[in-house]
Structures are given as C-alpha cells and as structure tokens.
A protein has these predicted regions:
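FNR/FR-type flavoprotein reductase catalytic core
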Residues: 73-211
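Short glycine/proline-enriched turns and hinge-like loops at secondary-structure junctions
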Residues: 21, 35-37, 99-101, 216-217
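Single conserved hydrophobic/aromatic residue that forms the stacking wall/gate
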Residues: 231-234, 238-241
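Local cysteine-cluster metal-coordination motifs and their immediate loop/turn environment
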Residues: 210-233
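Ferredoxin-reductase
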Residues: 2-85
C-alpha cells in the first residue's frame, strides 16, 4: 500500500470560519484514510508553481479537513475555490505525532498551529488541549475540541477571550498533570514550550511551520538547524520533524 500519492480530491466545502481563516473539506476514499495526526497535505494551486502545505485538521469517512489561513496569493486562490471543483493534492506527507496508549497528552496549538491538534486530540485519551490566539477574532475549533472530549484551555495575547497570556503560562501550571506534550505553532512558541518541558523532565514532540517546496525531503527548502544527539545539523521539516 502506498504511503502517499498525488490524486484528485472532490471539494465538498470551503468556508470562512474566522478572520482570514478557511475550513476546506475534500473527499478521496483512497488517500484520506491514510492520514495520521500531525501530517499535512500538499495542495496544488492553479497558476502557482509550488504547492501549499496545509496541516490535516481531521480525517473521517474519506474526507480530509484542511483549515488554513490566507497569507498570500496562493492561499487567496485556495479560498476562492468552489464546491464541486477538483483539487490536486499530494498526501499524506510528514511523520506526524506518535501517540501511545495509556499516556495523557497535553496538545498545544498556537494560531494556525491549532488545526492539527484536533485530529491528534481524537487519537488521545482525555487530552489537555491549550490553544493560543492573538485575539478573539482569530479563535477557531473550540467546539470541535469539546466534542472530542478534551479538557480545553483558551488563551489570547490581548486578553479579549479566555486567559490573558501565553500557552506556556498554562503549561507551567498543568504540566504535572500530563505525561507528554505535542505542539504546533510559531517557532518562538515552540522553543518556549520545549524549555518548559525540559525543565519539567517531560518528553515533547513539536511540529514546525516552514515554507516548503517538494514536501518530501528532497529540495531542502524547509531545512532548519536542530540538535541531533550531540551535534547541530540541518533537518528537513517535511520529512524529519
């Protein structure tokens, strides 16, 4: 069985759910069921050379849910795609999170790093989910997390909703309640989370947000520097991390 492939997906819906954030649902009975939590889909955008990497928010009954933010011309074109269109997608890509039975996980998402935490939460038992946004206009997926049975904590940078502060403020208070942490979001946030986990002696898995080209580890466009055992080397975000 193939781990990934390029195929056409039927666009079922593409709706705006927050300021500049869209919820796209595409159907392909062969590839959608292969997606694991923390993986991503590489979406071809007409008139653009490079695909757009979008994290898998959910996968159920042959339908991939892709929640994305409009940041440039490519995602702007994506937001204008209509129901019934055929979407060219390379999926599923990336390693994803490794979830073990018997562990309680803390899942942390910042901004557009929140969507992949929903599918991850559905694979966990009673997860603690901490979501962070700049303000109330960018808040997404709160009801979805509650339906998934998560203990949910909302934070905003400006205090316009939920707790006024950062996700790390909540993590410091609750890290003793969990066995492991999984996180996705801006790099400074991930660094801060990793530092908290290191101090508490808790394992931590992170999913980086980087610009990508091939999505399979060949072109090195998304390479970042990270420590491997005892030395620093380049890792491909799409394939290694």
């Amino acid at each position: 069985m193939k781990k990934y492939d390029v195929q056409k997906f039927e666009l079922l819906s593409n709706e705006q759910i927050a300021d500049g954030i869209f919820d796209m649902r595409v159907k392909n009975d062969e590839l959608a069921p292969l997606a694991k939590c923390g993986q991503f889909a590489h979406v071809y955008v007409p008139s653009k050379t490079l695909r757009r990497p979008i994290s898998v928010c959910d996968s159920e009954n042959g339908v991939l849910r892709l929640v994305y933010q409009v940041k440039g011309e490519g995602t702007k074109i994506m937001s204008e795609m209509k129901k019934g269109e055929s979407v060219d997608i390379l999926a599923p890509l990336g390693n994803g999170f490794k979830i073990e039975k018997g562990k309680r996980y803390c899942l942390i998402g910042g901004g557009i790093g929140v969507p992949p935490m929903l599918y991850t939460a559905k694979q966990c038992e009673n997860p603690l989910v901490i979501t962070g946004f700049r303000n109330k206009d960018l808040i997404i997926l709160q009801d979805d997390f509650k339906k998934a049975g998560a203990e949910l904590v909302l934070t905003t940078d400006d205090g316009s909703a939920g707790i006024h502060g950062f996700v790390t403020d909540v993590l410091k208070e609750k890290i003793s309640e969990v066995d492991e942490v999984c996180a996705c979001g801006p790099t400074p946030m991930l660094k801060a989370i990793a530092d908290v986990c290191k101090e508490a002696g808790k394992p931590c898995q992170i999913s980086l947000e980087e610009r990508m080209a091939c999505g399979m580890g060949a072109c090195l466009v998304c390479a970042v520097k990270a420590v491997s055992y005892t030395h620093l080397r380049a890792h491909e975000t799409c394939a290694d991390l």
